[in-house]
Amino acid sequence: SLQVLSNPLDALMGSLSIDPNTDKPFEPMDYKEIPWSNANRCLRCASGKAEACSRCLDVCPANCIDIHNQSVRIDDEACLQCGLCVAACPTETFNTRRHTSRMLYDQVARAASAYEQCYITCTRALARKPEGNEICLPCVGMLSADIWFSILTDFDNVSVYLPLGVCDRCRTTTGEEAYTQAIATAEEWTGATVGLEVDGNNLNHNFTRAYIRSQFISNAMNGAERLVSASSPVLAGAKAIADRINSHARSLDKLQTQLDDVMGLRTTDMRQSMLTQDRRLVMGALQHDPDLAPYVKLAAPIWDSSKCTVCGDCKNTCTTHAIDIDERGKLTIKMPFCVNCGACEIVCPEPGALTMVPMNTSELVVRDRKAEETERLEAL
C-alpha cells in the first residue's frame, strides 16, 4: 500500500509513536499510563520489613504508592503516570503495557539505527506528535541506568531533548534527578556520552546514508521484496533494522537457557531464579563487549558461614531467587540473578553474615557452552 511505501520503518516494525494516526491531535495522556504492581516481586512485602527497600516511595513525586500488609497499591487518582517507580524498582514490582525495559531499548534502537540522530524526550518538552526519531516518554527518568548502558554500548547518536526550564516547572519533581543519575551512571560504565539538545530548531530528522543505502547490501530479501525496494529504497533498510532488533531479542532470550546450562535455574526448594529485563539488557551488552565488565560498578553480597545462623531471612527476601540455601545449610548466590539491591544484607539479623562488596561483573558474561563446543569441533 501507499502507506507502507511512504513509511516502511513504521510499517515493518510498528510505529515509533504511540498513536500512528496522524489525524489525531497531540494528547500527552496517550503516552502515559498508570503502572500496575505485583506484590510478589516487592522486597518490602517479601521481607515484611520497611527498611528492606523504599526506592519507589522515595522517587514517587505524588506520594501515591502504599505498601502495607503484603500489598502494593497505587492511588490512581493521584498518580502522575510518570513511570519513575517502574525504573526505580530493581525487581520489576511495577510494570506498564507500553514501557517495558526491552520495549524502550527496541524503540530507541529502531530510531538510532535509521536516523542520524535519535532524541529521547518527554511529553512536556515535545508538546507535539513525535517524529520517527523522537522517543516521547512520560518522563525521561523512565529509562534506568541499565537501559542507558545497553543503549550506549550499541549507539553513539542518542541525545536527550529537553528545552531549558522544562523540568523546573514540571510536577514530576523527582524526574530530573532520576534521569541525570541514570545517565551519569551509564556514561561512567561505558565511557560514552549522551547528547543534550535544548533548541527544537536544531533537531535533525534525516535518515542515515547507511539506512538508505542498505537496499543494495541486503542479501536476505526475497525477489518480491527486491521489487518493492526498487521503488522504496528505505524498505530494505527497515527490514535490516527489524532483523537487528530481532537478533538482539533472541540473544537476550537465549541467556536464560545459557544460565540453566551453567548453574541451573531452580533453587533447592524448586523456586525458579528470575532474570529481570534490565539485567538481561546489561548482560546482553556485556556478551557483546565483555571488556566493559570491569567498568560496570555494582555491589553484591558475600556470605560468611561463620556468622550465619541459616535463618533464611535473606533467601525469603530475595524475590528474584538469586539466593539458595541447600539441605546442608550452604548458602549460594547466583550473581546473574542478583539485582544488587542490598536488601539481603539489610534484613540479615546477624552482622557480617552477608556483606555488600564490589561485584566481579565478569560473572555476568555467560559462556555459551554449545557455541564453544561447536567451535571446538569445527577446529578439529
Stretches with model-predicted labels:
Residues 59, 64-93, 215, 219:
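Charged, compositionally biased non-catalytic regions
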Residues 7, 20-52, 63-81, 98-104, ...:
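Ferredoxin-like iron-sulfur electron-transfer modules
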Residues 1, 204-235:
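N-terminal secretory signal peptides and thylakoid transit peptides that target proteins
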Residues 229, 233-285:
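Terminal interaction modules at protein C-ends
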Residues 1-34, 38-40, 44-49, 84-190, ...:
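Flanking helices and flexible, charged tails adjoining ferredoxin-like Fe-S electron-transfer domains
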Residues 120-127, 147, 216-231, 271, ...:
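Conserved small-residue-rich
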Residues 42, 53-56, 60, 79-85, ...:
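Short cysteine clusters
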